[in-house]
Amino acid sequence: MFVCALVLAVGLAAVMGILYSNFDGQMRKELSKEAAYLAYGVEQQGVDYLKNIKDKSARITYIDQDGTVLFDNEADVSEMKNHSDRTEFQKAEKYGAGESSRYSDTLSEKTIYYALRLKDGTVLRLSLIHISEPTRQEAIS
């Protein structure tokens, strides 16, 4: 009986791990696509393009080459620290794009970040709170 329960628990944990991994990958793909779309708008219209976006499903941060935050749709940029030390920013600077997951002091939540370097060297960063599938679907609706 104990062995059956143990096998069932291990099997359930494995399935949950696979589902979590797939959902996490989907969130990262979504951020990548959204960043490319927003980057085009910023390159055409500048930061004003971001200021006119009503959809708040992702946090948007626009960062200068030196790490100074130029725009954020959820926080006061005058109170934000320089972002040049952030992993996703450094990867975007070096490789053109970068991502990371960590605890956000601003949002007080575990967050997934995706950063994309634009043609002028600025960086557009999108982030999502790392939440479960049902909660994410409710947030989008």
Where are the predicted features?
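Juxtamembrane segments flanking the first transmembrane helix
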Residues: M1-V69, E74-K81, R86-T87, E93, ...
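Membrane-proximal, non-catalytic sensory/regulatory domains of signal-transducing membrane proteins
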Residues: K54, E79-T122
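Hydrophobic residues embedded in beta-strands of well-ordered beta-sheets
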Residues: V69, T122-V123
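Sensory beta-strand/linker motifs that couple input domains to effectors
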Residues: L126
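Single conserved hydrophobic/aromatic residue that forms the stacking wall/gate
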Residues: I129-S141
